[in-house]
Amino acid sequence: MSYQAVIGLEVHLQLKTRTKIFSSCPAEYHGAEPNTFTDPLTLGLPGTLPTLNREAVELAMMFGLSLNCDVSGFTQFHRKNYFYPDAPKNFQLSQYDRPIARDGFLDIGSERVRIKRAHLEDDAGKLTHPTYAPYSLLDLNRAGTPLIEMVTEADITGAEQARAFLETVQAIAQALGVSDATPEEGKMRCDVNISLHRAGEPWGTKVEVKNLNSFRSVARAIEYEVSRQTRVLGAGGRITQDTLGWDEGGQKTFVMRTKEGEADYRYFPEPDLPPLDITPEWIERIRARMPELPAQKRERYLSTGVRAAEAQTLSLNVALSRFYDEALRAGPAGQQPDAQKLANWLLTDVAGHLAAQDQNITQSALKASHLAALVRLIDAGTISGRVAKDLLPEVMQGQDPETLVQERGLSVVTDTAAIDAAIDAAMAADPGTVDKVRAGNTKAMNALFGPVMKAMGGQAKPEVVRERLTRKLGL
């Protein structure tokens, strides 16, 4: 009997606040010189006292509500004690037994992943270990920035489900504006707890893989650990409860330390911060501020006729969905572009151009109204799809497609005499194909269709060309 994976995630999001969680020190340090975004509290100097950041609390409440959690009416902070250079206070302020949110869920496709808790805490500094150097470098700019840590129940069963879950969490955080949630900047980090068991048997010993900073790394670490633990258990070995790191170059895990338990941290209530009471009225004010969430956006797109795959892709990308919504609203009343066709153009043709330029939609000169106009021109039969594709590079540079079509005379040719002349020329140039078609090989007609469309510069409607070509061939 094969083993089944039991996976839980711990996701850390850096909240998008102006200042750090317990002091007035600015929180947006990215790109700054090391140790330039610090203050006495960040440095852990004696006599400094924390003051809780209200903005961080409200962002955490909003995030908890988006995960279908219950927001606690009473919460408090505890000291999590440990000695490490990146924590100059020698403790982290976290929420131990009274998190700000608990008992939520997210639906990933047809599967539900339960959210155990989400709690606030301050981040640590950053240690860098130069190769072969007898020292380490410490940057405390990150220390004290607000984090929300979300912990799932062990409901995840595989790497792709974990990846889809993280993509959904990222989309929610970005839609709410609570976090940039960019793994490449360290603003979204993930720890993975993995164990194996056979169906009907107790769960096995779990390991924790720490500080995975990309969704791809999460998926690969899970795949590697499932494979490794399967080999160990299959050979009669035992899994030890270790904390593991992920070697991106070697694509494997390595032991960092033996896993600590809660007793090792000696939690106790923070004496310098009073407990926080959160009233129902405060919760409802936060709920009223919440924008449309990805799941709601997906349902809205489906209701307009967008296919499930495109609706999912759009709903998980904040920038693309904003651009799409703007394009969908563009134009005179009653003349909006077809929703599915617009999605196709944005996610296929436009996305291809952006990828070739190593850009995202916010960096492009493309205007939503211009993409909408391009799709409307196709819908109205004013231009063909081929002409639209030829125009797209210029439209991507900010050109108005309607102006380009008018100035260059690119409208669809409706003159059947011109189409018939192009057909006659193609048939005269390839009599062998004409004979094949008339002998019953109708597929050979495509060899005539292409030259006709080329002669018309892509400005003839394909269905008109095919109908008149069929008539000319006597079919």
From Swiss-Prot:
Residues in coiled coil: none
Reactions listed under catalytic activity: L-glutamyl-tRNA(Gln) + L-glutamine + ATP + H2O = L-glutaminyl-tRNA(Gln) + L-glutamate + ADP + phosphate + H(+); L-aspartyl-tRNA(Asn) + L-glutamine + ATP + H2O = L-asparaginyl-tRNA(Asn) + L-glutamate + ADP + phosphate + 2 H(+)
Any Pfam family the entry gives: GatB_N
Enzyme Commission number: 6.3.5.-
Any one GO MF annotation of this record: ATP binding
InterPro entries named in the record: Asn/Gln-tRNA_amidoTrfase_suB/E, Asn/Gln-tRNA_Trfase_suB/E_cat, Asn/Gln_amidotransferase, Asn/Gln_tRNA_amidoTrase-B-like, GatB, GatB_Yqey_C_2, Gln-tRNA_amidoTrfase_suB_CS, Gln_synth/guanido_kin_cat_dom
Keywords: ATP-binding, Ligase, Nucleotide-binding, Protein biosynthesis
Disulfides per UniProt: none
GO biological process terms on file: glutaminyl-tRNAGln biosynthesis via transamidation; translation
Domain of life: Bacteria
Family: Belongs to the GatB/GatE family. GatB subfamily.
Functional summary from the UniProt entry: Allows the formation of correctly charged Asn-tRNA(Asn) or Gln-tRNA(Gln) through the transamidation of misacylated Asp-tRNA(Asn) or Glu-tRNA(Gln) in organisms which lack either or both of asparaginyl-tRNA or glutaminyl-tRNA synthetases. The reaction takes place in the presence of glutamine and ATP through an activated phospho-Asp-tRNA(Asn) or phospho-Glu-tRNA(Gln).
Quaternary state and interactors: Heterotrimer of A, B and C subunits.
UniProt protein name: Aspartyl/glutamyl-tRNA(Asn/Gln) amidotransferase subunit B
Lineage: Bacteria, Thermotogati, Deinococcota, Deinococci, Deinococcales
